[in-house]
Amino acid sequence: MKRSHKDYLEDIAEAIELIEEFTREICFEDFLCDKKTQFAVIRALEIIGEASKNIPNDFKRLHPEIPWREMARMRDKLIHAYFGVDVRVLWKTVKEDIPSLKGKFEKLRK
């Protein structure tokens, strides 16, 4: 069955929630030592990026407040440079970009 853009939007929203859940009660030092959480966050970011690539361009143009291109680029960096992921950049994404993205998605889904 073909998936709709709403399915992909749900995938993104769910991945955002999971990232927040995985990192809710840890500090950077704990994150730095926790390979399982790093791996889970990376996977969720890959899902966000992959789902964003499947959103129709017409829909993306209607919602320029969402960083579609950046989401896809992050996925590409994680997939193709998995051995060189900078954990500091990953943490900054989790703590700064994900909350902002969540707010934008909440508005979009209303």
UniProtKB/Swiss-Prot annotation:
Alphabetically ordered keywords of this record = Hydrolase, Nuclease, Nucleotide-binding, Phosphoprotein, Toxin-antitoxin system
- Specify the superkingdom: Archaea
Against Pfam families, the record matches this protein to:
HepT-like (PF01934)
Annotated InterPro entries? HepT-like, HepT_RNase_toxin
Active site per the UniProt annotation: 75, 80
O-di-AMP-tyrosine: residues bearing it: 82
Q: Could you tell me which PANTHER family the record lists for this protein?
A: RNASE MJ1380-RELATED, UPF0331 PROTEIN MJ0127
What role does it play?
Toxic component of a type VII toxin-antitoxin (TA) system. Overexpression in E.coli inhibits cell growth. Neutralized by cognate antitoxin MntA. Neutralization is probably due to AMPylation by MntA. Probably an RNAase.
Recorded protein name is: Probable ribonuclease HepT
Its taxonomic path starts at: Archaea, Methanobacteriati, Methanobacteriota, Thermococci, Thermococcales
- What gene name does this entry carry? hepT
